[in-house]
Amino acid sequence: MTPKQETQLKKLGPFSIAQAEKIGISHQELSRLVKEEKIHRMERGVYIHTDASFPREIDFQIACKKFGPKSAVGGLTALFYYNLADQVPGHTWMLVPPEKRATSKVYRLIRTKTPLNVGIIEINGYRIVSIERAIIEAFKLATKLGERTAIKAARIAIKNELTTLKKIGKMAKELGLDSYLTKHFEAIVGAIEE
């Protein structure tokens, strides 16, 4: 590994085998660097340079590398990230296309046909749903998260002026999930007015 390649790997943070190959490091050389402890294997197919900085959201970066560019952090993980849920997620919840599968117990996959380019924010090497999409998805996933969690998340976000009911409604319409918002509209408005 040349000094230039090493600098590039440090800047990448978590990286895939394909990214290593793009800068001229073969799969075999990568395996050798792992044995020499110059590169750390985070999990299957995801690596990081031992001197690279570990951001707070390293789990999100790894998950997005693992599940590809169309995946995004969502569900309970996104609600917790935005401080809209008290429950600490036991898994990293990921929105993925319907064909994605995972054998790892670390992730909770939400296979969705809703567009994975709407209401998604890209930050520091990972993708996460916006506050509005997190709330709409919570209503959609009410059987897994609970209606109370979804209503509470909407109420907290609106009361703390993180978003508005109008923005949530607009996002629901863009995603084609406005029926979920309509179903819970009275509960949200009632909770806000209290």
Residue ranges and their predicted role:
Residues 3-25, 29, 34, 42-194:
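Nucleic-acid-binding surface
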Residues 37:
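Glycine-centered, phosphate/nucleic-acid-interacting loop/turn motifs that mediate DNA/RNA or nucleotide
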